[in-house]
A protein has these predicted regions:
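Residue-level recognition of the GNAT/N-acetyltransferase active site
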Residues: 46-48, 214
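Short beta-strand-to-turn element immediately C-terminal to the catalytic PLP-Schiff-base lysine
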Residues: 43-44, 58-63, 103
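Glycine-enriched alpha-helix->loop->beta-strand junction motifs that scaffold or abut catalytic
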Residues: 37-39, 166-167
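Conserved catalytic cysteine-centered active-site region
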Residues: 33
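Glycine-rich phosphate-binding loop of ATP-grasp-fold ATP-dependent ligases
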Residues: 50, 54-59
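PLP-dependent aminotransferase class I/II
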Residues: 2, 7, 11, 19, ...
Length: 236
């Protein structure tokens, strides 16, 4: 991707919204934290993220001084000088209270991510023979499991079964981008719709299910989730 971006004179932007602390194996000898690979990277501090604030927030990181200055301009009305907008900008500063909270929570991020990986490994083990497909991670990469997402061709029935057992799940995300009303004008003409369908995207949207996973999740609770899935698998 970096070579492609360079060839076309484009910036490579990493979407790290759900990947705080994850690592990418660049080669057999080099692994890098996500957020250090592209020209810019964007992190979300929404409260449910691995590193979350008390409200909305986010961060852009870059090693490029020119881009850093541009982002600083955009975050506060395009100001270089107070009350003078050199470029169209926004009010998107992270307030000091949110920043202070994030600094405290940052100390615990590695431990929380380690706990998430332990819980995910237990799910992997317990669900190996169940009716779901578990996440895969390329060798050498380090996942942080903001979500633990399985796939099932009986997703809706499985979700209903888990709900009946008092187990909350979620679907991330039920409507693919290309089917969102905001982007209908990009859709192909009716005569070409079937040929231009994003079949794998639509299949994934119909199958994905996020199971409970967070650092404070107890092993006993996780085992109960896995047992309920095994019970469902035995019934179909």
């Amino acid at each position: 991707l970096r070579a492609l971006a360079k060839r076309h004179g484009a910036w490579l932007i990493e979407d790290c919204a759900q990947a705080h602390g994850a690592r990418f194996l660049q080669s057999s000898e080099i692994d890098r934290p996500v957020g250090t690979i592209g020209d810019l990277a964007c992190f979300s501090f929404y409260p449910t993220k691995n590193l979350g604030a008390a409200g909305d927030g986010g961060m852009v990181v870059t090693h490029n001084a020119e881009l850093a200055e541009r982002v600083r301009l955009l975050r506060q009305y395009g100001w270089r000088e107070r009350y003078i907008s050199d470029v169209p900008g926004l009010n998107s500063r992270l307030d000091e209270l949110q920043a202070a909270l994030l600094r405290v929570k940052l100390r615990h991020l590695d431990d929380w991510n380690h706990r998430r990986r332990m819980l995910a490994a237990r799910y992997d083990e317990l669900l190996a023979d169940a009716c779901v497909t578990t996440p895969t991670v390329a060798p050498g990469n380090e996942h942080v499991y903001h979500l633990y997402v399985v796939r099932s061709q009986q997703r809706d029935a499985l979700q209903a079964h888990l709900a009946a057992h008092g187990i909350a799940t979620a679907i991330h995300y039920p409507v693919p981008v290309h089917q969102q009303p905001a982007y209908r004008h990009f859709a192909p003409p009716p005569t070409h719709q079937e040929a231009n369908r994003l079949i794998e995207t639509e299949r994934a949207a119909a199958e994905v299910l996020s199971l409970p996973l967070y650092p404070q999740l107890s092993t006993e609770h996780l085992d109960r989730v896995a047992a309920a899935i095994a019970q469902f698998a035995a019934s179909i």
